[in-house]
Structures are given as structure tokens and as C-alpha cells.
UniProtKB/Swiss-Prot annotation:
Domain of life per record: Bacteria
A GO CC annotation given for this chain: cytoplasm
Enzyme Commission number(s) of this protein: 2.1.1.181
Residue pairs linked by disulfide bridges in the UniProt entry: none
One GO molecular-function entry: 23S rRNA (adenine(1618)-N(6))-methyltransferase activity
Subcellular location: Cytoplasm
Organism per entry: Klebsiella pneumoniae (strain 342)
Primary subcellular site in the record, as a coarse category: cytoplasm
NCBIfam families: PRK11727.1
Keywords attached to this entry: Cytoplasm, Methyltransferase, rRNA processing, S-adenosyl-L-methionine, Transferase
Biological role: Specifically methylates the adenine in position 1618 of 23S rRNA.
Name this polypeptide is given: Ribosomal RNA large subunit methyltransferase F
């Protein structure tokens, strides 16, 4: 009997354990990374970045019809089930306004990354249209290569370079442009030292030495910023005021629950009309996202 992962959204495709034979059929290169655990069961070495990348290629091909996906070495290799959960919970949030999950939603992904993970899942699951912003030239080029390598995505996903290092929405949301929602996986750590310490904890949990490569990777702008996620999301909240009439819902992942109180205080200060928290769980990991809007319920129900 296959065990279910606790806490995933009901529509998440990843409730069951990985079906490695099916995934190898979707991406044959994965076969080279399969090993046996002490119980004699097939698994992969999650400490090997190339194995994790091959697993992601297989998951995206098998579940989301993504035929071409690759990221440069050293960039964040995201856990697909958790990223899918954010998309499904966001769909539920939008459905509260319209009565059903909108099929023509326009979504802005802040810091879409080299992996383009949120647009890939959102396009396949709901047919949404995405704009992905990215500040890193290398990550932007990687994301564009993914779009160009998959027929049909060029009509659903457009990418936009953020050229201002201190801006989030400014320079990305154009005049007269509207979005049903924004989403973001903000940098969590507040310094390079903190990011390294977090990486070392992950390595210890995997039983690895200090010189081992970290399986999920991550560049500086993906992992840390001055002040950590509270500072980043706070800036996002302040900037969102300027686009209050152009975006129905602003949202962001929040890694730590104790980071919520200062964010709630700031949302009250800037005059957010509605604030929502969505709790999520992937296995033992608890996470959440917050959403805020400057529009009342009636205004959000009306099309732009």
C-alpha cells in the first residue's frame, strides 16, 4: 500500500510516494541515479544535486508535460510538491472571489528564478497566464530557455527583467497592466553566513560532511537579502500600495510563523482591506503564505 504524504492540498498530484519506474519512463536519465535503501526499496540519493535535478526533470515531464527543463549548476532546485501546493491554495483563494477557479487568471511571479517552477505548474494545472520577473541575467536566460524549449508556453508565459536591484514591483508592473494575483518565494536568510549555516544544517540532516554539495543549491539572490524575508516582504507590502488598483491579491510565502506579526502590523498600517493566511504542510515541514488586498470583496469579484 502506498503511503500518503500528510498535509498536501487535495488537488496536489504528489500525494503518493514517487513512482520511480513511471518517472524513469518519462525521463530515462533518472535510472542512472536510482539506488536501494536499507530496506531494499528503490530511491535516489537526495544529497546528489544531479540526482535531484534528474528527479525534477522526470516529475515535470510526467505530471506537467514539460519536455525541456534544466537549470545551471548552483541554482535553486525546488521541491516540486511544495511549490505545487502554493499554486493550488492560490487557486482556492481566487475561487473564493469568483465562485470557481478562474481559467483566465493573470499571475505575476516575483523572482521566477532559473527554474520557472510556479509558471510551469500554474499553466498546466489551470491554464493561467504568467509574467515572471527576474533580476539575475543568468536565471532570466535559463527561464527563457525553458519557455522556448516547450511548445505552447510562449503564449502563456512572458518574462520581464527587473533592472532595479532595490525594487520589487516598480519597473515590472507596467501602467494600465492588471493581475489577479502575485506570488513570491522570497529569500529567507538575512546574510550569506546565515544561508551557509542553513545549508550545513541540511547537510547534517542528510548525514553529509561539510564539503558536500547541497542538494537544493541556490544563488545569493535566491537564498538571502539584508534583513531576511521580513525585510523583503515588508518592502513588497510597501510597494504594493502603488499598485492597489492593478492587482487583486498580493501573496508571498512566509517560511517562519514568528515572522508574521510584524508583517500583519505593516499591512494594517498601509491600509490593506483584507488579509488572509493559508497554512500548508509537506511531510514534516510546515509553511504558509499570506495574501493581502486593497480591494473589498465586491471590487475583487468584478473583472478588470
Amino acid at each position: 500500500m502506498k503511503a500518503q504524504k500528510p498535509g498536501l492540498h487535495p488537488r496536489n498530484r504528489h500525494h503518493q510516494r514517487y513512482d520511480l519506474p513511471a518517472l524513469c519512463q518519462a525521463h530515462p536519465d533518472l535510472q542512472g541515479y536510482i539506488t536501494l535503501n536499507p530496506l531494499g526499496e528503490q530511491t535516489i540519493d537526495f544529497a546528489n544535486p544531479q540526482a535531484v535535478k534528474a528527479l525534477n526533470k522526470a516529475l515535470l515531464a510526467h505530471f506537467y508535460a514539460v519536455k525541456h527543463w534544466d537549470i545551471p549548476d548552483g541554482f535553486l532546485c525546488p521541491p516540486v510538491p511544495g511549490r505545487a501546493d502554493y499554486i493550488h491554495h492560490l487557486a482556492d483563494l481566487l475561487a473564493q472571489d469568483s465562485g470557481e477557479v478562474p481559467k483566465q487568471a493573470t499571475i505575476l511571479d516575483i523572482g521566477t528564478g532559473a527554474n520557472l517552477i510556479f509558471p510551469l505548474i500554474g499553466v498546466h494545472e489551470y491554464g493561467w497566464r504568467f509574467t515572471g520577473s527576474e533580476i539575475s541575467p543568468e536565471a532570466f536566460a535559463s527561464a527563457q530557455a525553458i519557455v522556448n524549449g516547450n511548445p505552447g508556453l510562449t503564449r502563456q508565459i512572458r518574462l520581464r527583467r527587473q533592472k532595479e536591484s532595490q525594487a520589487i514591483f516598480h519597473g515590472v508592473i507596467h501602467k494600465n497592466e492588471t493581475y489577479d494575483a502575485t506570488l513570491c518565494n522570497p529569500p529567507f536568510h538575512d546574510s550569506a553566513e546565515s544561508a551557509r549555516a542553513g545549508g550545513e544544517r541540511k547537510r547534517r540532516n542528510l548525514g553529509l560532511g561539510a564539503d558536500s554539495a547541497l542538494n537544493f543549491g541556490g544563488q545569493q539572490q535566491e537564498l538571502w537579502c539584508e534583513g531576511g524575508e521580513v525585510a523583503f516582504i515588508s518592502q513588497m507590502i510597501r510597494e504594493s500600495q502603488a499598485f492597489a488598483r492593478q492587482v487583486k491579491w498580493f501573496t508571498s510565502l512566509v517560511s517562519r510563523g514568528d515572522n508574521l506579526p510584524p508583517l500583519y502590523r505593516l499591512l494594517t498600517k498601509v491600509g490593506a482591506v483584507k488579509v488572509v493566511k493559508k497554512e500548508m504542510a509537506q511531510g514534516q515541514k510546515q509553511s504558509r503564505f499570506i495574501a493581502w488586498s486593497f480591494m473589498d470583496d465586491a471590487k475583487r469579484r468584478r473583472p478588470f
